[in-house]
A protein has these predicted regions:
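N-terminal Rossmann-like FAD-binding beta1-loop-alpha1 element of flavoenzymes
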Residues: 3-30
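Glycine-rich FAD pyrophosphate-binding loop
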Residues: 23-43
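Active-site substrate-recognition segment that forms the wall
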Residues: 45-48, 53, 57-96, 223-228, ...
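Rossmann-like flavin
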Residues: 89-207
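Helical element adjacent to the flavin cofactor pocket in flavoenzyme catalytic cores
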Residues: 183-239, 243
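C-terminal catalytic lobe of FAD-dependent flavoproteins
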Residues: 296, 340-413
């Protein structure tokens, strides 16, 4: 029997979930507080669909590195300690997860979900509903300038799907990296990884959904509170009235924690600030990458999205209330110029920041809450676009009372 499902949050996670539910014959009401969809973390993210490279941020050595990077504008990670009890709790859980064993366990959970997501994205594209969203099977090249990090990456690489490259092989594959060849010690190449424009994907999802009579979009409406009866949610209250439904899914990213507090549901999600630059893709060949590149040491990703080059970087913890930090953008541009000195218009690139809704251990939170018709699809961090289709499929299967396509071990609070 078809259900009416309310989804809270219209970023790539909420829209993907709406699409999967509509395809499964359900009725969907999508609630979004902004004037349009995809306006937060989904708007100008890195654009990489890195299905084979999903290692959590929490890893051995990261806390010590973070302390060494304090106050350095060009460092991959900036940390500002605040009086927030939530931040302290999140950092404590993050620190406990910063060891090789836990990193590998959570990395395996993420890989399980990302491979499901890859399969679902391929199926969605084959349906022909989603138009052009700058999708390319461009491959991903993870370059290393440090021998220790490269040896670790080589140990954990899946040699069936990933290749180890020497500096000479790196330049042969991606000649635009010629200016830093002397700094490179090696790379991991994943030829099957993809890239796409997340915001364009969101807009195309919405365009399709709005052709479906079972879909309703409520923009500029914030959920003020849940209406509950025993262990069920019967509705949500917005300033425009009460919306009732059979099931409710929270896909509200960074807003999820405050929203769920009224139900005494605590979720360990913290907004980790990241930055991106968008610059016109140059016509001159071998000026910038044709394939996805991740500069591992600097934590910078490069992706070609139609006629744009998207460059995304950095993690700032404790800066969730501030706007664009110009000193970080300036430092990012300086690194880009050293890596790709022939790239024009870096100084005039369009700057953006977003807050990645992140769990301490890395995997998102998926599944049912103590309220048996309230579901969570939150905490995807920097992998929201990569994991969106798989997460949507899981929630759709669960809500339609079917078995999850993968084990949900590791995806709970």
């Amino acid at each position: 029997m078809a259900k009416h499902v309310v989804i809270i949050g219209a970023g790539v996670i909420g829209l993907s979930t709406a699409y999967a539910l509509i395809k499964a014959g359900q009725t969907v009401t999508l609630i979004e507080s902004e004037t349009d969809v995809g306006m937060h973390t989904s708007f100008a993210n890195g654009g990489q669909l890195s299905y084979r490279y999903v290692s959590p941020l929490a890893d051995a050595g990261v806390p010590l590195q973070g302390l060494r990077w304090v106050g350095k504008n060009d460092s991959p990670l900036n940390l500002k300690i605040t009086p927030s009890v939530h931040q302290w709790s999140w950092l404590a859980q993050f620190t406990l997860a910063c060891n090789r064993k836990t990193n590998r366990i959570n990395g395996d959970h993420l890989l399980r979900l990302s491979l499901l997501s890859k399969n679902m994205m391929n199926l969605w594209r084959q349906k022909g509903d989603l138009g052009d969203f700058a999708w390319e099977k461009s491959g991903k090249l993870i370059i290393h300038r440090d021998s220790k990090s490269f040896l670790k990456a080589n140990e954990t690489a899946d040699k069936q799907f990933q290749k180890t490259l020497t500096p000479a092989e790196i330049i042969e594959l991606e000649p635009s990296l010629k200016h830093i060849q002397s700094q490179l010690v090696g790379a991991i190449y994943a030829p099957d990884d993809e890239s796409a424009d997340c915001y364009l994907f969101c807009k195309n999802l919405l365009q399709y959904l709005q052709t479906q009579p079972q879909f309703n979009l409520c923009l500029q409406q914030s959920v003020q509170y849940f209406i509950k009866q025993d262990n069920r949610i019967t509705g949500v209250a917005t300033h425009q009235g009460i919306i009732q439904a059979d099931d409710f899914i929270v896909c509200a990213g960074n807003g999820s924690r405050e929203l769920l507090k009224s139900l005494k549901i605590n979720v360990p999600i913290l907004g980790l600030k990241g930055y991106s630059l968008s610059v016109k893709y140059p016509q001159t060949e071998n000026t910038v990458p044709k394939i996805n590149v991740t500069d591992y040491g600097n934590k910078i990703v490069y992706a070609k999205l139609n006629d744009q080059l998207r460059i995304a970087a950095m993690v700032d913890i404790g800066y969730d209330t501030a706007g664009l930090r110009e000193n970080r953008i300036k430092a990012l541009k300086k690194i880009i110029k050293k890596t790709f000195p022939e790239l024009p218009q870096v100084d005039s690139a369009e700057s953006w920041f977003g807050l990645r809704p992140s769990t301490p251990k890395g995997p998102p939170i998926l599944g049912k809450t103590a309220y048996h018709n309230l579901w969570l699809n939150i905490g995807h961090g920097s992998l929201g676009f990569t994991l969106a289709a798989g997460s949507a499929e899981i929630l759709t299967k669960l809500i339609t009372e079917q078995k999850s396509p993968i084990s949900l071990t590791g995806f709970t609070r």
